[in-house]
Amino acid sequence: MAEIDARLREEVHLLGELLGQTIRTQLGDDFLDKIERIRKGAKAGRRGSAAGAEQLTSTLGDLGDDELLPVARAFNQFLNLANIAEQQHRVRRRRPDEPEPFELRVLDELLERLLAAGQKPDELARQLGRLDIELVLTAHPTEVARRTLIQKYDAIAAQLTALDHSDLLPAERERIAQRLQRLIAEAWHTEEIRRSRPSPVDEAKWGFAVIEHSLWQAVPQFLRRADRSLQAATGLRLPLEAAPIRFASWMGGDRDGNPNVTARVTREVLLLARWMAADLYLRDVDQLAAELSMQQASAELRAQVGDSAEPYRALLKQLRERLRETRSWAQQALTADIAPGAAVLQDNHDLLAPLQLCYQSLHACGMGVIADGPLLDCLRRAATFGLFLVRLDVRQDSTRHAAALSEITDYLGLGRYAEWDEEQRLAFLQRELDSRRPLLPSDYRPSADTAEVLATCREVAAAPAAALGSYVISMAGAASDVLAVQLLLKEAGLRRPMRVVPLFETLADLDNAGPVIDRLLGLPGYRVRLHGPQEVMIGYSDSAKDAGTTAAAWAQYRAQEELVRLCGEHQVELLLFHGRGGTVGRGGGPAHAAILSQPPGSVAGRFRTTEQGEMIRFKFGLPDIAEQNLNLYLAAVLEATLLPPPAPEPSWRAMMDRLADVGVKAYRGVVREHPQFVAYFRQATPEQELGRLPLGSRPAKRREGGVESLRAIPWIFAWTQTRLMLPAWLGWEQALGQALAGGEGELLKNMREQWPFFRTRIDMLEMVLAKADASIAALYDQRLVEPALQPLGAQLRDLLSQACAAVLELTGQSRLLAHSPETLESISVRNTYLDPLHLLQAELLARCRLRQQAPESPLEQALLVSVAGIAAGLRNTG
C-alpha cells in the first residue's frame, strides 16, 4: 500500500502529540497510557493480531462509567484533528516540481479540450458567463459539530498553513506550535455536544457563518481564477456581472415534517440574511473607501458626486449610508413590524450601480490595475450574493396543502377537496386561479394547521422576489399539487411569478414524474404563470430508502430523460433540482463525477442541487477548499452542457432494467418483508438513541411507525454508525451477482468503461463497501442483539460479502480501492481511532439500555460523543 504523504503524516502526528499533552495535563499519565493501550490494541487488531484485539476489548470493558466520556472525547478529538490535517493537505502550497491538484487545473484542461473539439472562443466565453448553478445549503440533523468548535478547528487549520512556510525562523515555528497547543487545549476543554437541539434560526445562523468565514473570500478568488483561465484560453474575460454559481438555503424555510419552522421563523431568517448581507458589504465598502482616494474620475461619476476632491469616496459614502440604513432597519424589524424607509436598499441594482460606476471610471481614467483589485472582488460578491445573501426556498408536504384546501372547500360548502379525484381538483383549482375574486371570505377562521400554511404563503407574498428561491412540494404526485400551492399563494396576495416545484421522491412518484409534468404543461393558463424554466426536484434520499440504490438510481435517470424529452416537446426550458445527501445511500458522492453522469441534455447550462450540513463544512468550510469545489462544479456543468455524454446503448438500458428489478426485490425482501428486520434494526443500531440526541431542529420521524416512517437521514446515519452501511449497497449484491453468474460480465464491464452513469454508480458503491466493516457490525450484534435475531445479522453480513465479491469481479481487482491507495491509506489510518469508538459505542448502548439513563447523564453524553466521533471519522454520515 502506498504511504500517505509524509507531510500529512507529520502533521497528524504533531496534532496527536499536542492532544496527548493536553490530556496528560488534565487527566494524568495513567489515563494517557490507557488511551495509548487502546490505540495500540486497535492498531494490532487491524493487523490481525488476536492479542491486540483482546487487549483492546478488555481495556475498554474494564473502563468505569466515569472514564467512558473522556475516552470517547479523546478519540473523537483525534479524528477531528486528522480531518483538519487532511483538509489542509488538499490545499497546501505546492512545491515548484509538484503539479497543481486536479480541482484547480480542471477548468484550464476542459477549456483546452472544448477549443480542440471545435468550440468557438466567443461562444465558449458566452456560455461560461451564462451558466446558472445554484447550491442550496440545507440544515442537517447529523451535523453534530458546534459552531464554537468549528471556529477553533478553522484556527488550527490556519496555523497548519503558517507552519507550511519553509523559511520560518525557529522562534516563529515555536510560536505557531504554542498557538496550536493552546487551540487544541481550548477545543479539548470545550463541550463538543450541544445540550439542546438547535432552533431553525440557529441552523440558519450556522449557514450564514459559512458564508461569512469562507464563501465570502472563496467566491471572488474562484471567479478570478475562472476569469484568468478563460482569458488564457480565449483572450476574453468573464462579464463583470457574471455569477455562474449562486447560493440558496433551506435553513428556516424547510418546514416539511418540522413543526419548529413557522412563518415567523421564515420571516426572522429572511431579515437576518438581509442584516448579515448589509454588514458584510459595509466591511467591504469601508475598505474600498480607504483605498479609493484618487481624484481623477469620469464625467458619469462626477455627475453623481459633483466636484468633490475625492469622488470615489463621495460615491461610496452614499452607498455606505444606505447600507447602514438597511442594516439598522433589518435589526429593528426583527422585533417590530416596521416598514423600510426610502434609504433602505431594496433592489440589487442599487447595490451594484455605484460599484460598477467606480469600476468603469477607474478603467476610463487609466487606473484599471486599481479597479481590478478589491473593488472587482466586491462587485463579484454583489453579483453573487446580492442584498439577500442567499435565496430562501420554502418546502412543505403536499398533504398539508391538500388539508388546508379541504378545510376551505368544506367551509364554503363545496365538499372536501381531499376526497375529490384529480380531474375535480384541477377543475376547481383552475377556476379559482382564473377568478378575480378572493377564495376566502373575510369571516373565515382557519384551524391552527391551516392558519400556519396561509401565514407562510403571506410571508412569501410579502418578501422581495430576489430574497426567495423556490416553493418546493415534497411527496408531490399529481399536477394538482402544484396548482394547489399557486392558488394558496394567489390567495395570500402574491402578484408575481414564483417557482413552484414538485419533488418526486418515491420510486412510484419518479416513474410518474413525466406524466405529471406533461399534464401540467398542457393545462390552460399554466404556461402564463410559469415565467422561466419548469423546475422539477428529483429526490435521492427517499427513493433509495423506498427501493434501494440500484432501482432508485435507474428510476432517477429515467425520470430525468423523460422530463428532458417532454419539456423539449412543450418547448419549455427545464431546470432539474437534485436533492442529494452526503452519503451514497442518499445520492451523495463526488459532485464532478455525478454531474458528468447525468442523462444527455439534462444539464443544459443549469444545475441546482442541495448541499447537506456536514458536507457543507467539508466542502465549503475553508476558503481554499471552497474554491476547489466551486471550480469542480463550474467545470462539470460546463462540460455536461457542451460535451454531454452519449445516450446509453439499448443493451445497457435492458441490463439496467434487469439490475433494478432484481435489486428492488432483494432490497424490499429484507427491509420490508423480513419479519425480524425492524426489531433487528432497532437493537443492532443506535436508531432509537439518535432520536433522543440534540442533533437538529427536525424530528427524526415523520410519524409513529416502522422503517417507512423514519426520515432518510437517521435511517442511513444509524447504519453508518455500525459500519454495515446497508442502505447504500443492499440489492446490488443480488443484481450484480446474478448478472455475473449469468455470463453478462463483459456487458457490465463495457457499461462501466463507456457509460459515465454506470461507472459513477459502481465507483460510489466501491467506496462505501471499502468503508463498511462486517467485523465491526458483528461486534454490535454480539453486545446488543438478542440471540433469536442474530442469524439475520449474520445473513446481512454475508450479503455485504457478496456485494464486495461482485464489485471485485466486475472491476478485476484483488481488493477494493486497489486503484486508489491514498484513499485506502486514509481509511486505514482512521480505523485505528474508529475501532475503539465503535466498541465503546456498543458498550455505551448496552449500558444505557440496561439503565435507562437521563439525557444529561455522563453515559448519554459519552454516547453522543461516540456518535460525533464516528461521524467525523467516516466523513459523509447521513
Swiss-Prot record:
Active site residues according to the UniProt entry: 140, 545
Organism annotation: Ectopseudomonas mendocina (strain ymp)
Gene expressing this chain: ppc
Its job: Forms oxaloacetate, a four-carbon dicarboxylic acid source for the tricarboxylic acid cycle.
Keyword Magnesium in annotation: yes
Protein family: Belongs to the PEPCase type 1 family.
Alphabetized PROSITE patterns for the sequence: PEPCASE_1 (PS00781), PEPCASE_2 (PS00393)
Name this protein carries in UniProt: Phosphoenolpyruvate carboxylase
Keywords: Carbon dioxide fixation, Lyase, Magnesium
UniProt xrefs under InterPro entries: PEP_COase, PEP_COase_bac/pln-type, PEP_COase_Lys_AS, PEPCASE_His_AS, Pyrv/PenolPyrv_kinase-like_dom
Transmembrane segment boundaries: none
Record EC number: 4.1.1.31
One Gene Ontology biological process: tricarboxylic acid cycle
Gene Ontology molecular function: magnesium ion binding; phosphoenolpyruvate carboxylase activity
Keyword Lyase in annotation: yes
Superkingdom of source: Bacteria
Catalytic reactions on record: oxaloacetate + phosphate = phosphoenolpyruvate + hydrogencarbonate
